[in-house]
């Protein structure tokens, strides 16, 4: 039986939501991850240090595994102040701030309307060493949804990278060959997370033979050529790419609807899904760097000391999973996953 032992991984981009669902989402994310960076687009969004610390307490109250530490992020708005950034940095619990272009994704209506509005904040982040996390899509109606990422790179991110050369930036959940190239050509202060579902699927999986709402996420799945570029980047061993699931649960009825929500739930089996991709590419030896080394190295945090073991042993995913008083349909529901984590 094939086994692979790696340093305990981290998830550098996950949505846990809030309220009674935390018991379920925290259970899944803490099963084998050492740390997870918790996204702040809750309702209301986590816009202050006090809100971030209170949210962290609610996460810890949901009784994660003892080895797990939640890392917090601030939600940037047009009104975020440099003083708030300094306060967040001083807390020792908030490690990043997130740029959501207004209206780009779930609960992002309070986001930034123009990057220029937060330039004083970005300057403060550069000064104190706080990372900028970026949802890389424009939201103007004239830009096709499949082109939102490339347009963002050209019109928004490139100027930020140029104007703040010492600011560490993570381009989150990249979905295009254009983003891969952008990150590869940028300096060492620019990196990217890649999700399991963008490695495993392309837009055909979502649209051919009927609409499959559980594959609907933002940024949206792209054509296969972009998927192949993401797989090549993730499995390459490059230190610029690391694991961020963007696991984003919604209740089944919110997904299977006339106007369904964006987000795919993968926290139930994230490392196992990534292992399938790396095995298919013949690059299992690079999984540890992607899952366990590149993220903490970029964030300036120590690597985890413990290990986890993956075993090539298939197991069936449930058709649905508990989600507070409701249920969530996970990726690969009713199908087998080829790897098991012990």
Swiss-Prot record:
Family: Belongs to the metallo-dependent hydrolases superfamily. DHOase family. Class II DHOase subfamily.
Required co-factors: Zn(2+)
Assembly description: Homodimer.
CDD domains in the record: DHOase
Name of protein: Dihydroorotase
Annotated catalytic residues: 246
Residues at which Zn(2+) 2 binds: 98, 135, 173
Organism, scientific name: Vibrio cholerae serotype O1 (strain ATCC 39315 / El Tor Inaba N16961)
Keywords, alphabetical: Hydrolase, Metal-binding, Pyrimidine biosynthesis, Zinc
């Amino acid at each position: 039986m094939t086994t692979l032992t790696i340093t305990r991984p981290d998830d550098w981009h996950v949505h846990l939501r809030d309220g009674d669902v935390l018991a379920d989402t925290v259970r899944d994310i803490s099963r084998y991850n050492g740390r997870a960076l918790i996204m702040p687009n809750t309702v209301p969004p986590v816009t202050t240090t006090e809100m971030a610390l209170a949210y962290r307490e609610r996460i810890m109250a949901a009784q994660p595994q003892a080895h797990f530490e939640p890392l917090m992020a601030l939600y940037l708005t047009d009104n975020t102040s440099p003083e708030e950034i300094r306060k967040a940095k001083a807390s020792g619990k908030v490690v990043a701030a997130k740029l959501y272009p207004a209206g780009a994704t779930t609960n992002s209506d309070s986001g930034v309307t123009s990057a220029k509005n937060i330039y004083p904040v970005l300057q403060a982040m550069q000064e104190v060493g706080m990372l900028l996390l970026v949802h890389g899509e424009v939201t103007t109606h004239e830009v096709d949804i499949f082109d939102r990422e490339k347009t963002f790179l050209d019109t928004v991110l490139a100027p930020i990278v140029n104007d703040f050369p010492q600011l560490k930036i993570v381009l989150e959940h990249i979905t295009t060959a254009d983003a891969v190239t952008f990150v590869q050509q940028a300096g060492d202060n620019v990196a990217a997370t890649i999700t399991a579902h963008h490695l495993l699927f392309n837009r055909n999986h979502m649209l051919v033979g009927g609409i499959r709402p559980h594959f609907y996420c933002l940024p949206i799945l792209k054509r296969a050529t972009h998927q192949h570029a993401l797989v090549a980047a993730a499995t390459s061993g490059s230190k610029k790419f690391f694991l961020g699931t963007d696991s984003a649960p919604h209740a089944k009825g919110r997904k299977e609807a006339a106007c369904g929500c964006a987000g795919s739930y993968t926290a139930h089996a994230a490392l196992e899904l990534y292992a399938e991709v790396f095995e298919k590419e013949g690059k299992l030896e690079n999984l540890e760097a992607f899952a366990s080394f590149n993220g903490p190295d970029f964030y300036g945090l120590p690597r985890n000391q413990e290990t986890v073991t993956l075993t090539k042993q298939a197991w069936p995913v449930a058709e649905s999973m508990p989600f507070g008083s409701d249920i969530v349909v996970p990726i690969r529901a009713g199908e087998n996953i080829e790897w098991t984590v012990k």
